[in-house]
Regions:
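Short beta-strand His + acidic residue motifs that chelate non-heme Fe in jelly-roll/DSBH
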Residues: 97, 105-110
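Non-catalytic, conserved peripheral segments adjacent to functional cores
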Residues: 1-93, 110-134
Length: 136
C-alpha cells in the first residue's frame, strides 16, 4: 500500500429501526484534524480524476452506491513512489480511505446508480487559493 494511505474498516450496527455506521471519530488514529466535510456524487460510469493536494489529507467514505478509487504515488523520496493502489468503496465495502497529501487520486462510479462520496478533509476549502493540483 502507498506510504501514508490508511484504511479503516467500518462497523455497521443494524437493528429493527435501520442501521448506524460511525465514519470518523476525533480519537481515530486515521484522522489528524478537522477541516470540513463535503458530499460529492458520481453518475454511473463517470470518472473524476486526477488531482492531488499539497497539504490536505482526504478521508473518503462512499455511503450510497459503489466507487473505484485509484491512487498514484508520484512523491519524490517516498518509499512507494510509482505505486498504484485501487480500492472499492461503498455499500458493499464500508471503509474510510485516507489519502495523504501529494498522492494523485481519482474515482469512477461503478454499477448502475449515482454514488455518494463523503470526504472529511483536513483543510477548509479556500476559493481564492485552492489546495488542489489537477492534471488536465
Amino acid at each position: 500500500m502507498i506510504d501514508g494511505v490508511m484504511v479503516k474498516q467500518l462497523r455497521v450496527l443494524p437493528d429493527e429501526r435501520g442501521r448506524l455506521m460511525e465514519i470518523l471519530r476525533e480519537d481515530d488514529e486515521i484522522y489528524p484534524r478537522f477541516g470540513q466535510v463535503y458530499l460529492t456524487t458520481g453518475y454511473p460510469g463517470v470518472v473524476k480524476a486526477w488531482h492531488y493536494h499539497k497539504v490536505q489529507f482526504d478521508h473518503f467514505c462512499v455511503v450510497k452506491g459503489m466507487m473505484k478509487v485509484v491512487l498514484y504515488d508520484s512523491r519524490d523520496g517516498s518509499p512507494t513512489k510509482g505505486e498504484v493502489n485501487e480500492f472499492f468503496l461503498g455499500e458493499h465495502r464500508p471503509i474510510v480511505l485516507r489519502i495523504p497529501p501529494l498522492v494523485y487520486h481519482g474515482f469512477k462510479t461503478i454499477g448502475g446508480e449515482e454514488a455518494f462520496l463523503i470526504n472529511v478533509c483536513t483543510q477548509t476549502y479556500r476559493y481564492d487559493a485552492p489546495d488542489r493540483k489537477s492534471v488536465v
